[in-house]
Curated annotation (Swiss-Prot):
Its cofactor is a divalent metal cation. It is found in: Cytoplasm. This is Protein pelota homolog. Belongs to the eukaryotic release factor 1 family. Pelota subfamily. NCBIfam families: pelota (TIGR00111). The gene is pelA. Its main location: cytoplasm. Pfam families: eRF1_1, eRF1_3.
């Protein structure tokens, strides 16, 4: 993403944003909220004097409008963000309009920008030059390919074939060929992950049959398979080392710490009331929040108060397993400095 800060005073102002990928559109879904004023170019029917005589001939023309946001919907698989609200600037003031924001679509957002908002903008900008990392989670007879988005792993495809130990050699080789074929279209790094020896066998197959892919890949040992293997890879910090974006790795690590402390009845609390109390007493060292809640006024106040009390705030993606686990705990938790 590219960003151009127009003017911000005491946290309020305008930032022009240029999303370049579906990751950037996802970031936008957390940077635009009801009540914000959003400007973008769109198409609307603009009537001329001639059109009024023949209204059915009114043509749609590109116009720049500003809407007061009422609803924001992220459509992951169409790479689109739908932003609906009342027009405050431009033709047909007072009418409803929906902006369909896509990659390479400039938008200006006027709002109060919190510290976490600015950090999200910085993350999107800093990640714009990174190539997409893919993880092939492989086990005997099945391989799953995942594309690592900034909000978590996105499954691309699953390949299944009878390649167990009792299967013929050509069957296993056929499975490897099937698993390697989609990798030919990938330009970024590929991580081959899984338990046992099959990942190493597949890596040797790539080196012999597809050396260009092998040169752009690395092997990582995991205990789990499928999506679980991907989470292990991220938790080990491998993605961060390759792509330079450490956020997903932090999410895995912090949620592992939350669950560890819960199991040990350690310095941990969760739930709005409990976390709010910990923050007010200065006991919260790190506050962990689901991205589903960051626009909730009560939670936003807790995040601001936590930062004032020198606690760090970490926002977890609800599209990723650690964020799903946090949501099951009420969407907010805090690692404590001392017991309450």
């Amino acid at each position: 993403m590219k960003a151009d800060v127009q003017e911000i005073r005491q946290g309020y102002g305008e930032i022009r944003l240029f999303p370049e990928s579906v990751d950037d559109i996802w970031h936008l879904s957390h940077l635009i909220a009801p009540g914000d004023l959003v400007f973008a170019q769109t198409f609307r029917s603009v009537e001329t004097a001639t059109d009024k005589l023949r209204p059915e001939k009114a043509e749609k023309r590109p116009v720049r409008i500003g809407i007061r946001v009422e609803k924001v919907e992220f459509h992951q698989y169409s790479s689109r963000l739908r932003v609906t609200g009342l027009i405050e600037s431009g033709p047909d003031v007072g009418s409803y309009h929906t902006l369909n924001l896509e990659p390479n679509f400039e938008v200006s957002v006027i709002r109060f920008w919190s510290k976490s908002d600015r950090e999200r903008v910085d993350r999107a900008v800093n990640s714009s030059g990174s190539g997409l990392v893919h993880v092939l989670a492989i086990e005997e007879g099945e391989a799953e390919l995942f594309r690592i988005r900034q909000y978590g792993p996105e499954q691309v495809l699953t390949i299944t074939m009878g390649s167990g130990k009792g299967a013929p050699v050509d069957s296993r080789e056929g499975f490897f060929i099937e698993a390697a074929t989609p990798l030919l279209q990938i330009t970024g790094p590929v991580i081959i992950a899984g338990p046992g020896f099959i990942k190493d066998d597949f890596a040797r197959f790539l080196k012999n049959r597809y050396p260009a892919i092998a040169a752009n890949s690395m092997v990582v040992e995991t205990r789990r398979i499928g999506r679980g293997a991907v989470q292990e890879v991220i938790g080990q910090g491998v993605i961060g080392k390759i792509a330079g974006d450490l956020q997903l790795g932090r999410e895995v690590q912090v949620m592992d710490e939350v669950l560890k402390r819960i199991a040990m009845e350690g310095l941990i609390t969760y739930g709005r009331a409990e976390v709010g109390q910990a923050i007010s007493f200065g006991a919260a060292d790190q506050v962990i929040v689901s991205d589903r809640l960051i626009r909730d006024p009560e939670v936003a106040r807790l995040m601001e108060q936590a930062e004032q009390m020198n606690a760090t705030v970490t926002v977890l993606s609800s599209c990723f397993e650690p964020g799903e686990r946090l949501w099951a705990l009420g969407g907010i938790a805090a690692l404590l400095r001392y017991a309450l």
